[in-house]
Amino acid sequence: MTVPEAQVDAFGQDHVPPVVGTFEDAATGKTIHFWTKPIAQLLEVSVATYAQERIATNPTLNNLKGIDVVLGGDHGQGKFRSVIKIILRDDAGLSVDTLVMKVGHIDCTKDTYEVLKSSVAGPLNDSLKEVIESGALQVIRDPNGSVFFRMKNDEQDDQQLTIISSLHIRVFVTGNLTYSAAILGNVNIAGGWCTWCGLSPREWSPTEHDKGQLWTLEAMAEVRTSIRVGITADTSANRQGCVDVPLQTCVPINSYSLPILH
């Protein structure tokens, strides 16, 4: 059961409020409601709260060296939900503990490409970009001895603050094949084209087939641009599964955990 945001807000402590929005679904004419949460701010607040609650009883938290942020999404019971799993890792790269936080929600009957594009995809992409550009969550002590967490920002230079440690952040994306295909622009899985390398079903079906050239976000964008400006004809063979532009533009494809197609 999900606690209503209004009730969570009422507690008033260490809560990151959602950013709400609406849009009119062109396919149904209905008003779709959605919300997202800024992931960078959520990391600062949630990890700090977790550390304060657990570090006294779990001494391994003192050895934290890195954080993995895994974004995922799924649809069910008339709603789309996007969550992040925060994996806390020690200096050996082993998982110390995990947190799961909801970062996006859409009231919709289907999580189509257009629905995602018109709602949570943009804000979550910008939010992930902020985390990636920062690259680390810093543990900081102020002159009064209080400890807090802050995303690394090279433009911030407060000499009164002491950086205790800097937790390197890696970002990944996961989800079922439908969700992964949608956010990569491979709408409706594009007739079975490989998400990894762009081979057609005829090419990847043989057991001992040759490996194709691995996709990059830049290569996908080039395919769409070439078709849009008329350099390349808009055919299935030329699209190679790239039906539309990717909705996630800051996480490289080799950081996706995709279902195995071949």
Question: Model regions: which residues?
Answer:
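Intrinsic disorder
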Residues: T2, T22, A26-Q41, N63, ...
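Structured nucleic-acid-interacting core domains from mobile-element enzymes and related host factors
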Residues: E5-V83, E155
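Generic structural signal of hydrophobic/aromatic residues within well-ordered alpha-helices
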Residues: Q7, I39, L43-V47, A51, ...
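Acidic, metal-ligating active-site segments
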Residues: N63-S118, G122, L199
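Inter-domain linker/hinge segments that demarcate the starts of reverse transcriptase
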Residues: L116-A136
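Charged (Asp/Glu and Lys/Arg) segments that form or flank catalytic channels of large polymer-
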Residues: K129-H262
